[in-house]
Amino acid sequence: MTSAKPFPITKRQVWEAYKRVKVNRGAAGVDGQTLTEFDGNVVNNLYKLWNRLASGNYLPPAVRCVEIPKSDGRVRPLGIPTVSDRIVQMVVKQVLEPVLEPVFHEDSYGYRPGKSAHDAIEQARKRCWKFDWVLEVDIKGFFDNIDHPLLLKAVRHQTQERWVVMYIERWLKAPVQMPDGTIMTRTRGTPQGGVISPLLANLFLHYVFDMWMQRHHSNVPFERYADDVVCHCHSQSQAEALFRDLKQRFTQCGLELHPRKTRNGLL
């Protein structure tokens, strides 16, 4: 029975998570198992997954790193979890996202239900008629440099579910299998490509940026899509002062502004 398990995770939650993962498809992780292969014994696979998850015995495997070429010649590391791990991450996401959505800032647009990049662009266009200067903010290697203790502090502030915090902490510590097969440990960051990563990234910047802006620069409206931000200022001096403050703020939180992509300008 579900009630006999240490954590109140139901078979229904695992089933619903599986259905969402199946719709999203995705490549195989380090175990090489495809979604089609998982489906070959889906009932048994989901039962075993639920049993480990509700018992507190689920341990995330390593994440498979795939390097995606970028237009500037560099590569973007993408983390591919196993099918089972994607399902477990979706279980946690389905519990945590409804808690966080009402808390998140209205001008945070990335990876959120009912919001899009087009919404952010439309809002920015409207504000550009009222403000003459913008500060474009980009965080260098954001996903790879998220501070684990700060993120876990934010998670604990938003949920009392011990198992949610426990599994998020395990994911943050899960190693990465590099393209050459070597295993790398992680002390910072959350892999791009994980089901839970975008939600955790938004939670991190909710405190590092959104709430900080409300407290210290409440007269500066902004649109944020993940780690890309447009801030609207009345003057060059205001934009430059905001840049200095943000640089210090991000440094305090273990992040760095991208030197080429962060800039201010007259509209």
Where are these regions (language model features)?
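Electropositive, glycine- and tryptophan-enriched low-complexity nucleic-acid-binding patches
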Residues: 89-107
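Duplex nucleic acid-engaging cores and interfaces of nucleic-acid transaction enzymes
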Residues: 84, 88-91, 125, 152
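Short, compositionally biased low-complexity segments
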Residues: 10-26, 62-65, 94-99, 129
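Non-catalytic, polymerase-adjacent accessory regions of viral genome-replication enzymes
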Residues: 1-43
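Conserved phosphate-binding loops in nucleotide/dinucleotide-binding enzymes
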Residues: 77-82
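Short alpha-helical scaffolding segments that buttress acidic/His motifs in well-ordered protein cores
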Residues: 17-21, 91, 167-172
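Conserved polymerase palm-domain catalytic core
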Residues: 52-67, 71, 103-267
